[in-house]
Amino acid sequence: DFTKDIYINKDKIREDEDFVILYKGFLFSNNLTNDVYVSYGYGDTWKNKDEKKMKPSTFGYLATIDVGSGDNLQFVFRDNQGNWDNNNSQNYILPIEESQEVLSFKTIAERS
């Protein structure tokens, strides 16, 4: 479950798209550090695990995540002093939807 301290800029995340995550959790609110990272992977086994340093802002920490394939994206936050925000050891989880290929067709008459 998400808390009021984590926001994303899309209603749903999809394969092969990116999204921005805004973190305002205790690592930000307690001002413990200037360096916060988001660690993430796909599925229960954290396939293709990656980590990004988040950019500080007055609103929280920001990162853009390029979504790969999997059923869900699991992620946690950490700082450079060994403090973690991992949703009480449950991780934060977002379901991933398959990419939606949009095709646009025109009649031959419209192409002339």
Regions found by a protein language model. Give the residues of each.
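Glycan-association/targeting regions that enable binding to alpha-glucans and other polysaccharides
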Residues: 1-112
